[in-house]
């Protein structure tokens, strides 16, 4: 913990399942503009999260000597006040717990984010102390969007009001009040000041501005005795101070352990939940900067819910998403907060997600709850009502992606797609064939024979065109085909044609595709987005925005693709691939103690040492590894 080169890259995330979060490094030194102790949505201002309370510095005072446990990075590679040197232990199996030792003083800090409330709770316990001890708490306030910085200014309000064992304050109009309260009566000393030149090195690495000033209104001070606990709460609403200790205990009791790989992933899955005031339910695409996105929602939903026996949340999210997609199909303004719902593969992934639901419950149950929606989506596609998904006479779907990316490989540079996938997209048409066959099986289950035969006829047409269009002489699949232009790049999108329950490929063709994915794309962190043997391979995701955009889908490795790869392997080779897949899991399990603890980063460099990059926690990655673990267990028994 005292070695900053080792501790600063490790981050910690906790959420309230309603969009708010708390995030920093394990030594509480903020290294991103997205870091903060209390980061909450402020819908009255915009659709971004906002950092209200950046950090809380604690100072231990004995015999007039002060020992500040805080840590900030300032310009010029200066770290102050170096409180990390007092850390003796850190653990986050259930709740993040830090043990500080200052001379004869041992102070324990535990942190929990109250579910469904914008309230962070921190419990301090004086485990040992042989002299009179005082704690001083100095809050660092930001009151700004996660995408901006704050600087010293004359506009910020210095006003505050006393509340139960604390104060409330608000720096700018439009923001909610920030309540800072303690379980114990204390003295607040008003001495406003700006701490200037706080620096965030992760933003420097990403080519962005990286400096800001933070406002400190003063400090709280109180005595603490050996064995005593004090609970601090920061929130957008007031709470009775006398209830804080019981509330902390209650929240801890509700937490499940993070004592193994599976439990870490389950906890990570819950962090993507978002419940809004109208009871709409969502899946966030990732932390700390992603919002809810349609494609991510449908890909991640089965793994984040069905694979951990949480069918109820699947149904709640699907209810919200269906409402939004019906609005889109009907040409109405979309009322739900799901971005990119117009993307052409979204309806295809929605049907795939419902296919997983049918396998978890039954086809009868799936048809009863979602049959009409599935029919409506199929008709929407067949009637060519989607603005960028055209069903052609050969049975394949055509998408225009020349000027605006329409697939998950959506990075742009200078206003143009970096990977201009256009025409017949391989995974779109694998999804379409799978959807047609699945819908035909649903129709058969409920006795709709005419519908079944029509769907099967459409599927047969699509199958033949798929083979004629995508299968090349080397045994793998073109990534996309547009007229006479065939993209020969070896990319992972062909893995879906092997992994899906219904595939136009024969067993031998599947094996050929899987083999080339294994040889050229497989890494310990998922499948590369491009083979090293293909032109334009760029496996390291670092540098300014444009540099990263060019690398985003040109060789970086993605764990969620690894999930589909493992599914394809198990379906083709059954139990003979169990030990191989178990070894693959080691690469993901290692991530539980790297980068953001207990979860999986967005993407990884395509070359050793396969460093984690991008968002610190990514829903599709967590979901697909959970789904692969479930599949692994099924094939073991």
What does each of the following model-derived ranges do?
Residues 137-140, 354-356, 373:
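Transmembrane beta-barrel strand/turn architecture of Gram-negative outer membrane proteins
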Residues 68-95, 102-106, 383, 515-525, ...:
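Non-catalytic C-terminal accessory modules of carbohydrate-active enzymes
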